[in-house]
Amino acid sequence: MSQCQIWVRHHLCCSFQIPTLAASLFQLGRCRSVKEFEKLNRIGEGTYGIVYRARDTQTDEIVALKKVRMDKEKDGIPISSLREITLLLRLRHPNIVELKEVVVGNHLESIFLVMGYCEQDLASLLENMPTPFSEAQVKCILLQVLRGLQYLHRSFIIHRDLKVSNLLMTDKGCVKTADFGLARAYGVPVKPMTPKVVTLWYRAPELLLGTTTQTTSIDMWAVGCILAELLAHKPLLPGTSEIHQIDLIVQLLGTPSENIWPGFSKLPLAGQYSLRKQPYNNLKHKFPWLSEAGLRLLNFLFMYDPKKRATAGDCLESSYFKEKPLPCEPELMPTFPHHRNKRAAPAATEGQSKRCRP
């Protein structure tokens, strides 16, 4: 960890306004200036900042440069960005995006995060690739997501916004989880958190029903949605509203009850919805070609009761990954030079993927 990273990590718990923080970093010589990076093109927008593809003029390395969006009302850095920086400074794993350093803006009015660059994100790949991922490739992707998530959860962090557009992939087939703007550290006792997190299509039923008790299980529900999306080549539960999202879940998994989900009826919003009576689990009908091991894994991820839902460790032990077709090696994942060049073009599209509209 660089001197700059150590200093930032130590001081971010303080209530710095951003000009004060940026000036302090620059004047003390602890962080580099953004002038040392050549912005090549804008490649996207995270939860709390704009992301550029850039070149480090000192090393010629291509990086992702994320400009932290300012809080105009408070003339400072949003608490969400502070959380993202402090969390990423703690995390070092091959399947989690790397925060290399923090640099300051041209006029000391802003800060930028220098991240490891990944050539593509899974959402845009799924929309544009001519041939869908094979099942062996899907397994390769999911294993990497699960390894990163196991590390994250063992570090007592919940991502809270897992979706295909937040999964990046390098040209060497390495999948990395990104965008930690909504992530939270958790502990015992579990502190209340807002249920208005996680993109709608990937949101766990307990969140839709208003729980403020959030655990790693909300990430695991999202993993189930991601696996299903990779297998089906389209989003599994593309709800247009919260009530529509709940209805889609019930159509797929059946109506929840106290028998299968103790405490369900006491959730804050449980009494506000009139759930259809649907007694069947339709996962097998949705994926008739999927093996029994694959269906068991999906069902384990889609358990209504968060306490019974699969953990990342449970999933990594699944027999689904030990049966044919076996997961391919990351190095054997397909590359997408046409898509990469499209992203790298100066006129690259800046709009969000259709897969992450909610």
UniProtKB/Swiss-Prot annotation:
Subunit text: Heterodimer with CCNQ, the interaction is required for kinase activity. Interacts with ETS2. Interacts with PRK2.
Pfam families: Pkinase (PF00069)
Organism expressing this protein natively: Rattus norvegicus (Rat)
Organism domain of life: Eukaryota
Enzyme active site: D161 (proton acceptor)
Modified residues (Phosphothreonine): T194
Keyword Nucleotide-binding: yes
Annotated residues for binding of ATP: I43, G44, E45, G46, T47, Y48, G49, I50, V51, K66
Protein name: Cyclin-dependent kinase 10
